[in-house]
UniProtKB/Swiss-Prot annotation:
Belongs to the universal ribosomal protein uL15 family. Residues 1-29 have a biased composition (Basic residues). HAMAP family: Ribosomal_uL15 (MF_01341). GO terms for biological process: translation. This is Large ribosomal subunit protein uL15. Gene3D superfamilies: 3.100.10.10, 4.10.990.10. InterPro entries: Rbsml_uL15_N (IPR027386), Ribosomal_uL15 (IPR030878), Ribosomal_uL15/eL18 (IPR021131), Ribosomal_uL15/eL18_sf (IPR036227), Ribosomal_uL15_CS (IPR001196).
Length: 149
């Protein structure tokens, strides 16, 4: 017999609604718990298969270690122009009124040392530290040394 009512309408008034007797189809017991329940226990195999490394610790927390206070990456003046593109260098070589600014701290260096030679082109160099020879050679080509924090 065809009926226009859905099954849920027919089951109104019947306690179990077609899902058996006591405790069936209710709450989280019929599906192994709710949410992330049992990840260390009855769902462990699935957790290890699909989410490896979810549980447990890895590595050490080093509260007692301090970062090296003497860490000071250096660059020599003969490598200064390698931090600037060739097009920029040509642009400033043609226009004598403007001077390029090279910030070595953006390239990851803290100190500028004086090994090598600079081309005879003025340049402004920004760094945390300068050696005496580096400062002397930069000023000799008409440049300037700017200290940054």
């Amino acid at each position: 017999m065809v009926s226009h009512l859905k099954k849920t309408r027919k089951l109104r008034g019947h306690v179990s609604h077609g899902h058996g007797r006591v405790g069936k189809h209710r709450k989280g017991g019929c599906r192994g718990g709710r949410g992330k329940a049992g990840g260390m226990h009855h769902h462990r195999i699935l957790m290890e298969k699909w989410h490896p490394g979810y549980y447990g610790k890895l590595g050490m927390r080093t509260f007692h270690l301090k970062k090296n206070p003497l860490h000071c990456p250096v660059v020599n003046i003969d490598k200064l122009w390698s931090l600037v593109s060739d097009a920029t260098r040509q642009k400033y070589a043609e226009d004598k009124k403007k001077v390029p600014v090279i910030d070595v701290t953006k390239a990851g260096f803290f100190k500028v040392l004086g090994k090598g030679r600079l081309p005879n082109q003025p340049v402004v160099v920004k760094a945390k530290y300068f050696s005496k020879t580096a400062e002397r050679r930069i000023v000799a080509v008409g440049g300037a040394c700017v200290l940054t924090a």
